[in-house]
């Protein structure tokens, strides 16, 4: 059982002569003798294909969706802080029957967001940002701040995996986030 598969962001080659870390770890686990893996909210679905054993891929939406419903927020929209999370956020918006808002970001380098634009309307809305991993919190806090500047009533964030590397705590405290909710996968 590996709730947080920490190598999941290394799911493809992004530079020459770099290994695909998620595939390497999948091979190591198989050689070590595991015959089944249970994990949660993989960063990329294709990681399941790196294994030669059955992978049970669980989703935190089973916990998060009832929580969001319990908030009874009016004018709710679901948002994703990056286009890569659009499939995940779309599942939430369809289930809840509310609009979906996307953020389009560009990065200068790893863990550094250069620019971000909102695609959709957040003015006078209660926004719930849905993500899989919060590491340095740069993306999620930038998205929250941009949405507050665009007139959102409130911005909450939910994420499956809470890494919170420095300077994440500072960024969250200084951001426009009303609330952050995580699982205890780490």
Task: Give a label for each model feature.
Residues 1-186:
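PRPP-associated nucleotide enzymes
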């Amino acid at each position: 059982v590996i709730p947080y598969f920490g190598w999941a962001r290394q799911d493809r080659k992004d530079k020459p002569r770099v290994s695909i870390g998620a595939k390497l770890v999948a091979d190591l686990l198989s050689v070590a003798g595991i015959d089944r893996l249970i994990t949660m909210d993989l960063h990329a679905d294709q990681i399941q294909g790196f294994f030669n054993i059955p992978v049970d891929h669980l989703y935190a939406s089973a916990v998060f969706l009832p929580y969001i419903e319990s908030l009874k927020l009016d004018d709710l929209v679901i948002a994703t802080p990056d286009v890569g999370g659009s499939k995940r956020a779309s599942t939430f918006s369809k289930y809840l029957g509310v609009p979906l808002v996307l953020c389009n970001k560009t990065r200068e380098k790893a863990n550094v967001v250069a620019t971000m634009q909102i695609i959709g309307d957040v003015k006078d809305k209660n926004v719930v940002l849905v993500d899989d991993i919060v590491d340095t919190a740069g993306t999620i806090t930038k998205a929250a701040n941009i949405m507050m500047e665009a007139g959102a009533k409130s911005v909450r964030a939910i994420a499956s995996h809470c890494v919170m590397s420095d300077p994440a705590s500072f960024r969250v405290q200084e951001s426009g986030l009303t609330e952050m909710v995580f699982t205890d996968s780490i």
